[in-house]
Amino acid sequence: SEKKGIGKMEHCKIIAVGDNVCDKYLSRGKMYPGGQCVNTCVYVKMNNMESAYLGKYGDDEVAACVQDTLKEIGIDDSHCRRYEGENGFALVTLKETDRVFLGSNKGGIAKEHDFGFTKEDLEYIKGFHLFTQI
């Protein structure tokens, strides 16, 4: 008989708490969402497991890009904080096939606000098998 616990990996639920950004590719005029926590959630979901993201968003088009992408992929971000101001971003260009980072806004609004976890947040987090914070 199977031991109690996580069981098969496809039933594993992971929540990542922390950063989200968009890389703004100046050479292409496009934005691509990312950040270690968002990337972790996406890779988990790509492997047919459940993932959720808990972080801080600004109220600009960069935040909308991340939120829309997570929604499209099916990653829950319902417990994220939303603040007035710029979401985190990095400015990127390409030199031949290499990415060159030109600068960033150092996380935008995320650096200005603590998480201030609520009891509801903590209960929500308890529903996951793995918690990662970056």
Feature roles, as predicted:
Residues 5-75:
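Glycine-rich phosphate/adenosyl-contacting loop at the front of the ribokinase-like
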Residues 15-17, 129-132:
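Structural motif
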Residues 22-24, 50-130:
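Conserved N-terminal subdomain of the carbohydrate kinase-like
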